[in-house]
Amino acid sequence: IECEYVVLATGMWSRQIAKEIDVSIPLYPDEHFYILSEPISDIDRSLPVLRDYNNCLYLKEDAGKLLVGVFEPNAKPAFTNNYKVPDDFSFGELPEDFDHFEPYLINAMNRVPSLGQSGIRKFFNGPESFTPDTNYLLGETPEVKNLFMCGGFNSIGIVSAGGAGKVTAEWMMNGEMQEDIFSLDISRFEKFHSELDFITERVTETLGNLYAMHWPFKQHTTSRNQKLMPYHDHLIKKGACFGQA
């Protein structure tokens, strides 16, 4: 297929596909957990989505049942047997890990006591891809002209789709964006950000950042010391503190 432009919008497969043409896409899937309760007789069908940030939980009504999911600070990378997303895994499920989810489920039962009386109809574990800073990956890739990335939505892809599509289309048509969206521009990353040792450790932290406090200039704690300045050791001896640039 010959074309003038290509948009890579293949979700958690994007990193693997782009690697075949030496393009770096820094994202990787984590395991994402939720449960669906048995029917709860007195649940309000108009119940809004509840978010308990202190306990990393979201809860929403689902056809008379309650769906409870978690964005935990100690996430698990998916597909760790070979660190490759299977080509045919669309809408697939990962093995259950109730021990990992149980502490958050207990907190959910404390928040919504009726949940503890209803039972669990479905325990779900599926892959969801995340980026090194929990921001999108948009724009033309530095390695290949006219190859645009549209992905890395960190579990909020549905709500982001309209705006991301609009930005991508305008970027392709005009060659640039009038607004300052550098925090979403894929060019903010370097090649090493997509290497397995970096990205698989970093996404254990970034999933939880969805429900963490977004302090200004917050520093990540994972995947540090990947690239150091020449006088790093000298500064350590002088008592310096370091941050990610």
Where are these regions (language model features)?
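Central helical "cap/lid" subdomain
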Residues: 3-46
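Helical element adjacent to the flavin cofactor pocket in flavoenzyme catalytic cores
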Residues: 1-5, 9, 162, 170
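C-terminal catalytic lobe of FAD-dependent flavoproteins
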Residues: 46, 54, 63, 77, ...
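Mid-domain catalytic core of redox enzymes
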Residues: 19-21, 35-77, 96-99
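Long, low-complexity segments enriched in small/aliphatic residues
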Residues: 222-245
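Pocket-edge structural micro-motifs
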Residues: 38-39, 61, 68-72, 122, ...
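A short alpha-helix-loop-beta-strand transition element characteristic
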Residues: 24-27, 51, 117, 178-180, ...
